[in-house]
Amino acid sequence: MIAILISALVLCVAPAQAMQASLAELASEHRRLLQTIEDQTPQTPYIVINTHDNQLLLRQGDAVLRQATCATGSGRKLEGDKRWHRWTFDTPKGRFAIARKVADPLWIRPTWDFIENAEEIPVFAEDRRRFQYGVLGEYALYFLKDFMIHGTLFEVNLGKSITHGCVRVGGEDLQYFYETVELGWPVFIY
């Protein structure tokens, strides 16, 4: 009988000790992950773009400095009559940085815009039909060569996944971001 009680006691103590060790390991891993997050958090303010909810946040640490409803990539696919005329209109995901800020940006119409509008594609890059002012709003903040945060002609479409990949915001928010955001500030898009 005593042997049975000792066996039962060992069976109870051993799992408790294993659980205690597991909890200690979890606590250590939790501290390590929190430190990793702290190390990854930018020291400057940064932009976070949620493409699922179409929200743009300007943050500093845990504080939200500005929140704006935006429009992001539609995910739609377009194919032209040539095999290299294929596009998917997604907003790129990842970590970027504000590389350039432009007032009164010039939109250089890409080939896909001519195909979408059933227009003849200009042969020469210098063709005047490619250049349009006012389409991108008053400002543009580039985070990649062909991708930017810019304005919109139709603020009613904010909050929708409707763009060709850029991030559109309303006029007041765009002016705030242009005046506030500095070159090099991180942009996180998911």
Task: Give a label for each model feature.
Residues 2-190:
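N-terminal pre-domains immediately preceding structured catalytic cores
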